[in-house]
């Protein structure tokens, strides 16, 4: 019993407080809107290369379309829009369970791309994604990670 508790403590200390994956791809070119969103998701670690479970791409795309109209969407509305979008593009309807849609929205919220307002969601402050990246991810989230990594580099002699 004592041994398993000791392991649990060790494991909990190994859980990162924050993490981000950044990937560099070729410059954006003549891609469809969905493909641009897909590359963005790959670039910031929301999607893994070769992953066929790409529902997060459609969720972000739907929220970006709603931003143009300054419209907030409930998780049910997001789900409906995602299903419609995937059907139009003749994509498999994998990962469209309500629980998965909410989990993917949470991932977008964790990266400050999406915010919850009452019981609805929107791109943070209906802002441009480039500005969100600079202000929330680059200056705040990424900087806090880099600062902590520097502390570890300074501590290891």
Per-segment meaning from a language model:
Residues 109-120:
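A short, conserved structural fragment
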Residues 69-92:
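Short acidic, hydrophobic short linear motifs in intrinsically disordered regions
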Residues 23-72:
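Short alpha-helical segments that sit at the start of domains
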Residues 53-57, 76, 99-102:
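Non-catalytic, well-ordered alpha-helical scaffold segments
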Residues 128-157:
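Short, amphipathic alpha-helical interaction segments positioned at domain boundaries
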Residues 91-110:
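Short amphipathic alpha-helical interaction segments
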């Amino acid at each position: 019993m004592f041994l398993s508790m000791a392991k649990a403590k060790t494991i909990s200390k190994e859980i990162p407080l924050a993490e981000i994956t950044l990937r560099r791809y070729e410059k954006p070119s003549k891609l469809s809107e969905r493909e641009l969103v897909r590359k963005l998701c790959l670039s910031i670690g929301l999607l893994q290369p070769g992953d066929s479970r790409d529902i997060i791409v459609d969720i972000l795309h739907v929220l970006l379309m709603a931003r143009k109209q300054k419209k907030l969407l409930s998780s049910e509305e997001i789900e409906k829009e995602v299903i419609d979008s995937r059907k139009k593009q003749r994509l498999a309807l994998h990962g469209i369970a309500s629980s998965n849609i909410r989990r993917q929205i949470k991932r977008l919220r964790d990266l400050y791309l999406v915010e919850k307002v009452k019981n609805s969601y929107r791109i943070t402050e209906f802002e441009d994604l480039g500005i969100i990246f600079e202000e929330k991810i680059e200056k705040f989230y990424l900087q806090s990670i880099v600062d902590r990594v520097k502390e570890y580099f300074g501590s290891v002699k």
